[in-house]
Amino acid sequence: MSRVAKQPVPLPKGVEVHVADQRLVVKGPKGEMSVPFHPAVELRIDDGGASLTWSDNQNAQAGTMRAILNNMVQGVSQGYEQKLEIIGVGYRAQAKGKTLSLSLGFSHPVDYSVPDDITIETPTQTEIVIRGIDKQKIGQIAADIRAYRPPEPYKGKGVRYAGENVRRKEAKKK
């Protein structure tokens, strides 16, 4: 049996969970999310939270659905946030509405358009904060922005996640 799927997902106040037309729908104070729900897994709502039941050969699917449900509940109740740091001379970012403009040493600025349900802020020119309710979408946007100029191992310049350790290499010796 899946150890992940055995544990119930606690539901905070103001969060509703139900399955409609093979889709798992979660509503909360920060918004609403829905994802396709596997037909071999069943959802039960108790006073302690939401739990899953499944047939024996669907252990992996049940664990996946439980993790997705937990991420959705946390997203609509608290939200998610990902921070990026820009390191390098002349490297900077600026948020203008739903567009993020990045100067990363190219001959042109890189413009990244942000989806409607995600907000991007730049507290300083070298920090980017991505906020929203969908954990997967926030992670993908952060990875897309980082991919424009990933940190290089010799000087450490580039876009990195906050707190990311970049392994440095020694320069070539004569």
UniProtKB/Swiss-Prot annotation:
Xref: Gene3D superfamilies? Ribosomal protein L6, alpha-beta domain
Q: Name one GO cellular component term.
A: cytosolic large ribosomal subunit
Cystine links in this protein are none
Q: Which SUPFAM superfamilies match?
A: Ribosomal protein L6
Q: Which GO terms describe its molecular function?
A: rRNA binding; structural constituent of ribosome
Going by the UniProt record, its keywords in alphabetical order are:
Ribonucleoprotein, Ribosomal protein, RNA-binding, rRNA-binding
Q: What does this protein do?
A: This protein binds to the 23S rRNA, and is important in its secondary structure. It is located near the subunit interface in the base of the L7/L12 stalk, and near the tRNA binding site of the peptidyltransferase center.
Q: Which family does it belong to?
A: Belongs to the universal ribosomal protein uL6 family.
Q: How does it assemble?
A: Part of the 50S ribosomal subunit.
Query: What is the protein named?
Result: Large ribosomal subunit protein uL6
